[in-house]
Design a protein with these regions (language model features):
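Surface-exposed acidic, glycine-flexible loop patches that form ligand/cofactor-binding
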Residues: 1, 94-102, 137
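Conserved aromatic-histidine-acidic binding/catalytic patches
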Residues: 7-15, 113, 151, 155, ...
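Activity-critical C-terminal alpha-helical subdomain
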Residues: 105-106, 110-222, 226
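Charge-dense, extended regions
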Residues: 233-266
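Domain-level signal for Mg2+-assisted phosphodiester chemistry and nucleotide/NA-binding surfaces
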Residues: 1-93, 124-127
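Acidic beta-strand-to-loop metal/phosphate-binding motif
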Residues: 8-12, 76-77, 102-116
Length: 266
């Protein structure tokens, strides 16, 4: 397999990553690598391991790996907005060790819409002696492309806001019933549960309410399975492509990937 360009997509959580993976698979015709032996060296170095040297049994996370023609892609979970720059910084070390700067196409970072995210990225990279300005990271005498996409693209919220727009078009009745359920659990009778299980602040409870609605939909579409399976198996499907392209935030994600993953259309 002759991979000439590598890209690394880093998103905040499993839901974000699942959406990106599904778009790559369903709408951009990328295939996932099936075996470790098939992976390019840079991707092999990103595979999670059990940190036995520390006496721990918790395995570090592994990305999903994809290819199409001469393009190789890793999709990695950051586990929170605060970790986007930290994950990218750790991967820069791998790029530097293998000296694959010429083959590296860049980082694509995906975060929730927050006013402070760009400042946070700049500060975290600087703590690691990397200079992040605009769409570029300066590291070890090299300039690496690093572009940020926010989901949703305006206002406050999480990736679930975009996904709820999708299921409104593909599963309308289910979405309405799930919204009714959300309204029920936002009533005063559930205030104690929300404070104990979600958050104490009302604005954060509103943030989690979208997640509850989407997870209710997911539980119907893929019972007894994590949310990622509903996204990849039931929501992001080829037959819904035209419907989803009518959703501005979804189309922006699609366009951002096409624009920045060079050779996708070649």
């Amino acid at each position: 397999m002759n991979i000439k360009k590598y890209y690394i997509l880093i998103a905040e959580g499993v839901t974000d990553c699942s959406l990106l993976e599904a778009v790559l698979e369903q709408y951009l015709q990328f295939s996932s690598f099936a075996k470790v032996d098939e992976l390019p060296e840079i991707f092999k170095n990103m595979i999670g391991i059990y940190p036995s040297g520390l006496g721990e049994l918790k395995r570090t996370d592994s990305p999903m790996f994809y290819y199409k023609d001469v393009i190789g892609i890793a999709v990695k979970q950051a586990n929170g907005c605060n970790n986007l720059a930290a994950k990218a910084s750790a991967l820069i070390e791998i790029i530097d060790q293998l000296d694959v700067y010429d083959q590296f196409g860049g980082f694509l970072l995906f975060g929730e819409t927050e006013d402070e995210i760009k400042t946070l990225l700049t500060r975290t990279f600087k703590e690691r002696d990397f200079d992040y300005t605009g769409d570029v990271i300066k590291a070890y005498g090299h300039e690496l492309t690093c572009k940020l996409h926010l989901l949703p693209s305006s206002g406050r919220g999480a990736i679930e806001k975009v996904l709820l727009k999708c299921v409104e078009k593909s599963y309308d009745t289910l979405t309405k019933d799930a919204e009714n359920f959300k309204m029920v659990v936002m009533q005063p009778e559930y205030a104690d549960i929300r404070k104990k299980c979600w958050a104490k602040k009302d604005e954060i409870q509103e943030f989690y309410a979208d997640k509850v609605q989407f997870e209710a939909i997911s539980a119907v579409l893929k019972p007894d399975r994590p949310v990622r399976f509903a996204i990849k198996d039931k929501i992001i499907r080829k037959e819904y492509y035209d419907l989803y392209m009518q959703i501005p935030d979804f189309k922006k994600v699609y366009d951002f990937l096409v624009e920045n993953l060079k050779c996708v259309e070649e």
